[in-house]
Amino acid sequence: HCDCQLVLAGGGADDDPEGAEVLREVEEAAAKDPDIHVLLLPPFSDLEINALVRGSTIVFQKSIREGFGLTVSEGLWKGKPVIGGAVGGIRLQIINGVTGFLIHSPEGAANRAVELLSNPELCRKLGENGQRYVRENFLITRHVKDYLLLMLALDHPGERVVQLAGI
């Protein structure tokens, strides 16, 4: 077993009818383990979330349904490997075994966490890969470049290849 702490951080969702009951169950279970901490954060807790992610070794996003959850991109951008449920937009952000791990069960998440905590070099490598992946695919600079290339292509309709110099 690894010497670690689990921090479950987030806020309530008004559009989640089961959320309050699930939260109660999580708090009840967490109260039995001194290494599990539940943090209920108010809206606009960006600084706290930033500090938690930066201080983490691994970021988890074990949703059973999820759009493009920013938790995953935030973790990757900060150089943390992310363990996430293989659902929705999470699958667009985690490259399994390259930037983190896609999992299908709590047991799978636990196994991958032990693997990462036992292998700091793998943790570092996945974190670096994740940061690069976010830089190349999800930052606004990438989108600006794509739009500039589109405008250049429209301005040069006969050319097959259009490039931006230095980008």
Please name every model-derived segment.
Residues 96-107, 115-120:
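Conserved acidic donor-binding segment of nucleotide-sugar-dependent glycosyltransferases
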Residues 50-56:
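Short alpha-helical donor nucleotide-sugar binding micro-motif in glycosyltransferases
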Residues 81-84, 94:
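Short hydrophobic beta-strand element within catalytic cores of glycosyltransferases
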Residues 10, 19-47:
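Nucleotide-activated donor-binding/catalytic signature segment of Leloir-type glycosyltransferases, i.e.
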Residues 115, 122-136, 143-149, 153:
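A short, well-ordered alpha-helix in the C-terminal region of glycosyltransferases
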Residues 59-60:
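A short hydrophobic beta-strand element within the catalytic core of glycosyltransferases
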Residues 50, 73-77, 91-92, 98:
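Short alpha-helical segment that forms part of, or immediately flanks, the ligand-binding pocket
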Residues 64:
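Aromatic "clamp/platform" in nucleotide-sugar-dependent glycosyltransferases that forms part
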